[in-house]
Amino acid sequence: MALRGVAGRVSAGVPPAHLASAAVEPPSGLQHRLVHGDQEAVVTEVGATLRAYTVGGRPAILGFDVTEHATHARGQLLLPWPGRVGNGRYRWQGVDYQLPLDEEELTNAIHGLVRWSNWTAETPSANRVVMRYRLHPRDGYPFCLDLVASFELADAGLRATLSGTNLSGVPAPFGAGVHPYLAVDGERVDGWRLAVPAETRLRTDSRMLPIGRAPVAGTEFDFREPRVIGSTQLDTAYTDLVCDPDGLTRVSLEAPDGRRLVLWTDSGCPWLVLFSADPLPSDERRRGLAVEPMTCPPDAFRSGEDLIALQPGETATLSWGIDVTGFRP
């Protein structure tokens, strides 16, 4: 359900004080509310962003208010690349390209080109919405992509897909990712129990660019067996993921009271980035854990590692979701 005010567009659940000023456009545009049983989610026009997700009225993600815009990539889609591109420069099929540097302090391009674009909703229903955006050629990325994101609430939780189709006449470099922050309670991540089935992590330099791989065994980054996060600061890319028998990789997060969230992803995402939200403002610092499924590692436009050469007419798709079965009382 997409909600509009008398002279503007507002979200479901907006307090009456905001409704009185309905002419004020939400910074994230039209709000698409999904409902299924005790679950509610909001996907925004700007960026096809997952702004909110609650179960029984309790937040399952660290989202943001309808009066705000997404900061620190909260709930955003990362296309046509996730993570950073060092100096914003890359070479593709013998041609050098320069991307906009939107992480100026580290001189990087970061998290793609569509986070602030207006996406169009197609055939929305009570519990599902499909968002579409046509990425046209531009300086630094002269390729045309048809991008589609679906969000659906089901009994077990949120199910989502993300795909890109190359509408250009030449191969296009392509990667994809998503950036939800899980939140199992209103406290800091320090007391949460985390399990990440990954054997390897990326080491990074001072600009957060990869400089090599390292085994997680015996380090503070080893969460192959569930353990409390404690004071560990995470801004870490993991790979060599271990799948369950059904082919899915699952990251679990459990609060001290036993409530548990599980983020799952399919084999289309051989990478996960975990980020403990340390740079966020003091009232939000470490109150959510970003678990980011990605088709390729950071800086893949330069390294080529797991970068998809999307052929003309070809589609690449990833699936992911949040299982809330253990989140209810």
Language-model features, listed with the residues they occupy:
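Short, Gly/Pro- and small/polar-rich lid/capping loops
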Residues: 2-37
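Active-site/ligand-binding surface loops and adjacent short beta/alpha elements
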Residues: 4-9, 13-18, 99, 181-267
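Extended, loop-rich substrate-binding clefts of extracytoplasmic carbohydrate-active enzymes
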Residues: 9, 101-155
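Acidic/His-leaning functional-site neighborhoods
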Residues: 39, 108-122, 193, 226-303
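Acidic-aromatic substrate-binding/catalytic surfaces of carbohydrate-active enzymes
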Residues: 40-98, 102
